[in-house]
Amino acid sequence: MRAYERLLKYAKVYTTSDPESGTHPSAAREFDLAHLLVEEMKSIGIEDAFVDEHCYVYGSIPATKGCEKKPALGLIAHMDTAPDAPGENVKPILHENYDGGDVTLPGTGTVMKTSTFPFLKELKGETLITTDGTTLLGADDKSGVAEILTAAETLIKKKLPHGKLCIAFTPDEEIGEGASLFDIPGFGADFAYTVDGGDVGGIEYENFNAASATVTIHGFSVHPGSAKDAMINASNVAMEFHMALPVMARPETTEGYQGFYHLCQMYGDVTEAKLGYILRDHDAGKLQFKKDNLLHIACYLNGKYGPGTVEVEIKDSYRNMLEKIKPHFHLVETARKAIEKAGLTPEEIPVRGGTDGAVLSWKGLPCPNLGTGGFNFHGVCECTTAERMDKATEILLNIIELYSK
């Protein structure tokens, strides 16, 4: 079975994670795919496959004769899809021998224009996989799941030499909790890769340092007819707070290594207002500056409107994995060789986000990220191609081969 055929099956299983539930997994529906995967893993020869009570799927393939002393390699992908777009009743569509032009998604009439998505022209002649426009596809990261299992099946069927291969599929990555209950000792790998990136050939070993901030503004309500010099409108103070942040440090104005402040939520009235931010930067020092800046703005506004008017609560989320990858840079070097062996040029770009691998790296399991061949994640224009998924699978097999020597 080719990887894309697995994706078509997995995409139809509803696994959107729920950021509000507070449970692990965040949604019981994630077990539906987990149980399907365990059954499939056992059917291809991964005899110890199981899913635990928190919806983490684990399994391993023992080393072949002569490779018992080779390092144990881990491959990890996540099963959940992002809550940013609908993930139920996904209807994948195959566009065979895609012509490289605009694509109309029939469920909504949404047009994927090459002027908006220039990469589409590079997919000409491939089998493009999209949705009907009513949902996301779930290539993030069911493509990674499919590619790992296709590589595992090939390994077993062809009896290729390899060290121990450890496989895991996680829940709740999209809400930042994919690695929270991951059993690293039980997983058994010396190091690993997440297969959760964008276009095939990508290697990611730098990610954002991340924090979140909740800004609460306490106002003072007075009848507007007699409010002069008395009312403090919390919503107005909230706008003043936000406008004190640099306009050129927002997601829509930054790229590459440039960090940002992202206003995710805002609501309020005269009496109280709240602002929810995420803060991101590859440089830990620059992230600290952003956190300090929020506190300085609050201090200024409290001086203007009175003590306690503005409160800021900041929480750290995850850290840049680079520091933990550097001592194990063979992971990057091996991935480069594997990608080149597949006839591609490695592309190494900083992740403008986070991965399970970033958290796992800081927990002691070095874990860079590899491309899956997908594009436009978290939206109805999400897509991939059968050929790029084949190539991603080939790269995984090349990595396994290189670590068996």
Residue map of PLM features:
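Metal-dependent amide/peptide-bond hydrolase catalytic core
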Residues: 235-405
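A non-catalytic alpha/beta surface segment that caps or lines the substrate-entry region
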Residues: 22-70, 74-76, 80, 91
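Short beta-strand segments
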Residues: 74-78, 168-170, 193-196, 216, ...
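Phosphate-handling active-site elements
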Residues: 153-166, 247-254, 405
